[in-house]
Design a protein with these regions (language model features):
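Residues at secondary-structure transition points
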Residues: 33-44, 72, 76, 80, ...
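Stable alpha-helical structural segments in soluble proteins, enriched in small hydrophobic residues
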Residues: 49-53, 88, 106, 192-203
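DPxDG-like acidic metal-binding loop motif
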Residues: 64-98
Length: 229
């Protein structure tokens, strides 16, 4: 059975990355973390990926793009680029949650107990973050929401399980969420290479988004809530 060739685009934070995959195999990836110069970087990275396909006489089957939450500007650039490719090549588009991409990266970096929970965080403003909670199978235990962090945030989870906090929103929470079960990991940013398994599954399941109407989860659209205790 032919394995799908998918281009993955991740632009939800200051890190811009692209990956090219065939099935679950990464054929190419490029990363730049120098700042929000995503538009020009994407054009270069994508041209490099397409040249690899041309040299191997292969064609793209789909484009996967991070869906947020994240930077309004970054997401807009990534999604508009993905839409342009899908329209031009007449191929489907796949969306992947930014928080799931980050969780996949953390799970790939170390061995965790099956009971460990994972809380990726995207920085918003002041003590606000955009977060979700997943188990070790990246199954959603708590949906994405905007949270104002205080000392009892996520208490119902952290008092029962070890919970790993990470992402650019986790740094400001370290001195507020203090518990023996709370673990903080630094320097975790969503990367396109960690989208591959999600893109592959979505393609096989034909779980595509409408290219014309798809919009990512911009931070400004979230409703602020206080996490349940």
């Amino acid at each position: 059975m032919k394995q799908p060739i998918i281009l993955h685009i991740e632009t939800s934070t200051h890190v811009c990355s692209v990956a090219l995959s065939e099935g679950n195999t990464c054929l190419f990836t490029q990363i730049n973390s120098e700042g929000m110069n995503h538009a020009s970087l994407l054009s270069v990275f994508i041209a490099q990926a397409m040249e690899i396909l041309k040299q191997n006489n292969k064609k793209l089957d789909a484009v996967a793009v991070s869906s947020g939450p994240g930077s309004y500007t970054g997401l807009r650039i990534g999604v508009s680029t993905a839409k342009g490719l899908c329209y031009g090549l007449d191929i489907p588009m796949i969306s992947v949650s930014t928080l799931e991409i980050m969780t996949k990266q953390v799970l790939n970096s170390a061995n965790y107990d099956s009971e460990t929970l994972f809380c990726p965080m995207i920085d918003a403003r002041r003590m606000e973050v955009y977060a979700a909670i997943y188990n070790a199978n990246i199954e959603v235990l708590r949906e994405i929401s905007a949270d104002i962090i205080e000392e009892n945030s996520y208490l119902e989870y952290v008092k029962k399980n070890q919970i790993v906090f990470f992402g650019n929103g986790a740094e400001k929470c370290k001195n507020t969420i203090i518990h023996p079960n709370a673990v903080f990991i630094e320097d975790v940013h969503p990367l396109a290479e960690n989208m591959i398994s999600f893109g592959q599954k979505a393609f096989m399941d034909k779980n595509f988004v409408d290219v014309a109407y798809f919009e990512p989860f911009y931070l400004k659209e979230f409703q602020t809530t206080t996490p349940k205790k």
